[in-house]
């Protein structure tokens, strides 16, 4: 699963600050991990799980939570899929 998303401001993904910009966000269900890419360059990754739902998502969406460090990516919904990806922890970061 993947989607293209534009962050209008800096966002925390796992333990990495991702600068405002347009990125591809992908979810690897086999490894329970999301990856944020700019082109082929990994900007951040984090552990995540797929929470299955009853209804197929009509559109891509992202949700954030506010932390002491700022806005943090919390969950991602991919259009056409039954479920929401919940970010559960930190893994690694790429270069900024």
Which positions does each model-derived feature cover?
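Primarily extracytoplasmic ectodomains and periplasmic/lumenal surface modules that are beta-strand-rich
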Residues: 29-33
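A short tyrosine-centered beta-strand micro-motif
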Residues: 21-27
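A sequence-level detector of short linear motifs
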Residues: 19-20, 44
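Short acidic, Pro/Gly- and aromatic-enriched capping/linker segments at domain boundaries
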Residues: 1-12
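Short, low-complexity, Pro/Ser/Thr/Gly-rich segments in the mature regions of secreted, periplasmic
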Residues: 83-95
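Short beta-strand segments
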Residues: 3, 44, 85-86
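Mid-chain, structured segments of secreted extracytoplasmic proteins
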Residues: 37-82
């Amino acid at each position: 699963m993947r989607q293209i998303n534009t962050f209008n401001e800096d966002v925390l993904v796992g333990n990495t600050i991702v600068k405002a910009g347009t990125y591809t966000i992908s979810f690897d269900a086999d490894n329970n991990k999301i990856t944020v890419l700019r082109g082929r360059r990994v900007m951040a990754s984090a552990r995540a799980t797929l929470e299955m739902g009853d209804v197929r998502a009509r559109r891509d969406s992202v949700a954030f939570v506010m932390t002491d460090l700022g806005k943090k990516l919390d969950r991602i919904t991919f259009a056409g899929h039954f479920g929401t990806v919940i970010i559960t922890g930190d893994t690694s970061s790429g270069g900024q």
